[in-house]
Each structure stands twice: as C-alpha cells, then as structure tokens.
Amino acid sequence: MIRVGYMGIPFSNSAEMSERLAKAIGLEECEHVALMSAVGVVSALMDGSIDYGVLAVCNRFAGPVMETREALEGKPIESIRMEWTHIHHCVFLKHKDAKVTKLVSHIQALLQSKDNLHRLYPNAEFSECEDTAYAAEMLADGTLSDDCAAVCRRDAGEHYRLYLAHENVEDNKENMTQFSIIRRV
C-alpha cells in the first residue's frame, strides 16, 4: 500500500491536507502516516519508508514555513501539487475556569494569531511545540499544566475533550496556508 507521511498528528491541518492532496493526485487507497515534523517527513521520504510527503510550505500572513524550507534544502525532492487552504485557530483550555499563563502551539499558529492572543491573554507567554494538535493532546493528557491553553483546530480540541474558550482567533479571517505533496526524485 502507498504511504503518505505528513507533518503533525491526527486532527492537524496537515492531516487534513494529506488526505485532500493524496486524492487530488489520484491516490484513493493509501495509508496516511503522522510524522510530527517536516524533518520527519523528509527523512522518511529519503529512507523509503513513505512514498509521498505532505508539508506546509507558506502562510499568507506569517510567511514561509521555515521548518519545511530547512528540511527540504539540498534534498532530491519534487513537489507534485500545491494547494491553499483556509486555516482557523481556536483556544482550548483544560477546564472552563483555567487561568491562562501560557499559550502553546506550533509557531505558525502563534504567529498567525499573535495580535488576538495578546489581546485575549495579555500576560500569557507563547510556547512553541511541534504541532497544533499535539498541543491539544499534551494539554489533555496532563503533559502541560492546567494554566496552559492549546491553540489548535476546533476538531483537535473537541477530540481531546477540552473546553473551547475562543474560536477563530487568527488575526486575519483570510488566513491561508499552502501545502505541497512531494516525492523523492
């Protein structure tokens, strides 16, 4: 079976785009493999453990995804198809009454929502993690303390049964990210 790796974990934007881009190039029957990072995707392509990879390339407002750019540098990889998708972020808490001192997410989500997050949580610090959905998972399983909030997709927070504090916190309602499906040349 054809394997398509993506950065992130289930309930991330990359997971959705992995399915969408695979279908767009005619891969109806394939296994989608969560690989957390762009480096993980590129390494798996290079060692042959996946056939295709899906990476976030650029955000309309936050700019290039540097993690992807650095992972691809000098590698014999080609892009097969690129697509833009709207990106929305929510703030989820462990409990309704949580006092937020730290906002945790992928750097791109924090950058795409920084003005609204500063307005909503003026004293909270930003803390980067590998993936938006991973922030929700870590908050739910207790890896993150109750004073943390996860900035992630709505379905990620709901999957982990977190409390939805704010929806659509991205600074620009036309927030979009370009994703690419790639393969080794």
Predicted regions located by residue number:
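Domain-level signature for soluble enzymes in the chorismate/prephenate branch of the shikimate pathway
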Residues: 1-185
